[in-house]
């Protein structure tokens, strides 16, 4: 019981928080720049690009619960949730890059198909990584003050990543691009690759740093009214 309710080392909290920083390097990019990338780089019409994003959101509504169910049923010596954070880190970041990669297809219908498939797979991997990651924070300790501390540090990491994406994306695109405009495909690819490498390292650190100290059954018994 002392282990369950004990303090979580600061290094573990910071390591875990890097997972949210990684997620926001992806999430903020999708929210702010994905549509712009589709129209400026892929050359898709706004309505088509918007439809691609809408379809992905609909698919994601089914993927999220599936990710939660599968991670909850996982049983390994590392726990339920840590393995998913580590297992999905590489494919998650690979499809992050592919979602902002211009394959050089001239047929706009095929471009739309590529955009749809790559974005749906990216969103799916986001769910299979971030859903277990979020659940992991709830099993690191049974101490509510410690959970609040973990959440606070995680929020700071996410906010920093948000500012990085908002403040550095276009300058990096211009720096690495072969041309001078924000529509340069090489600039986008180089920028996203940098973010993806950083995100991969952060997720691996988060997965290996955090420790699952309590079982979900204990959470449900001790906190019957707790809402996620």
Annotate each language-model stretch with its function.
Residues 2-218, 222, 226:
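Membrane-embedded alpha-helical bundles of multi-pass transporters/translocases
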């Amino acid at each position: 019981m002392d282990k369950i309710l004990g303090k979580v080392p600061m290094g573990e909290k910071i390591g875990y928080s890097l997972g949210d920083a990684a997620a926001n390097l992806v999430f903020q990019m999708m929210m702010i720049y994905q549509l712009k990338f589709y129209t400026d780089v892929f050359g898709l019409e706004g309505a088509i690009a918007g439809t691609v994003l809408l379809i992905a959101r609909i698919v994601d509504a089914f993927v999220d619960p599936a990710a939660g169910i599968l991670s909850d049923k996982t049983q390994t010596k590392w726990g339920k949730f840590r393995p998913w954070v580590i297992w999905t880190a590489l494919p998650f970041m690979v499809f992050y890059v592919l979602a902002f990669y211009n394959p050089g297809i001239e047929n706009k219908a095929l471009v739309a198909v590529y955009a749809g498939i790559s974005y749906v797979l990216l969103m799916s991997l986001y769910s299979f990584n971030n859903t277990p990651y979020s659940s992991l924070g709830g099993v690191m300790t049974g101490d509510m003050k410690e959970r609040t501390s973990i959440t606070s540090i995680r929020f700071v990491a996410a906010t920093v990543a948000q500012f990085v994406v908002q403040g550095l994306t276009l300058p990096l695109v211009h720096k690495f691009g072969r041309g001078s405009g924000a529509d340069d495909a090489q600039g986008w690819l180089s920028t996203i690759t940098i973010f993806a490498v950083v995100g991969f390292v952060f997720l691996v650190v988060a997965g290996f740093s955090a420790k699952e100290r309590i079982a979900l059954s204990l959470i449900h018994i001790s906190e019957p009214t707790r809402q996620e």
